[in-house]
């Protein structure tokens, strides 16, 4: 099963860039995009994504409030705040709202690795062999 992403950012350029990066992984798909927090919350209810990438500063409700509403609906869904305004104070408020990680738009390179860590191992990844359970061929 593919991992479904919801992207919420008021910048079309940022949404397009994220779409390009995320769609490079054949196991990931973009199930929806929203230009503001309110629309993002509505799409979250409707589309049931596996993970959300969300901007902080947007028209209407900001990313913290959108994340709070999403977390009330489905607390297990990881939310990543992707922002130009990263600070320790913002990270504190983000965690309180249910956001799992804050990534700065000025240094987005770790984004894919961080998403993979949030999602955990997938069915397509081989499981690590348990000690003492190695298969033996015919003797």
Predicted regions and their residues:
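Active-site beta3 strand of CheY-like receiver
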Residues: 47-53
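Receiver (REC) domain active-site loop signature in two-component systems and cognate sites
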Residues: 58
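Acidic catalytic/metal-coordinating carboxylates
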Residues: 36-39, 62-65
């Amino acid at each position: 099963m593919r991992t479904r992403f919801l992207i919420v950012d008021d910048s079309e350029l940022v949404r397009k860039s994220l779409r390009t990066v995320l769609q490079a992984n054949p196991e990931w798909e973009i199930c929806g995009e929203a230009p503001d927090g309110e629309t993002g919350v509505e799409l979250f209810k409707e589309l049931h994504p596996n993970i959300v990438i969300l901007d902080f500063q947007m028209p209407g409700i900001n990313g913290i409030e959108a994340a709070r509403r999403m977390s009330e609906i489905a607390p297990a869904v990881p939310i990543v705040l992707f922002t130009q305004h990263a600070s320790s104070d913002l990270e504190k408020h983000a965690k309180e709202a249910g956001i799992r990680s804050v990534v700065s738009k000025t240094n987005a390179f770790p984004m894919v690795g961080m998403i993979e860590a949030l999602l955990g191992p997938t069915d397509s990844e081989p499981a690590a062999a348990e000690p003492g359970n190695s298969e033996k061929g015919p003797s």
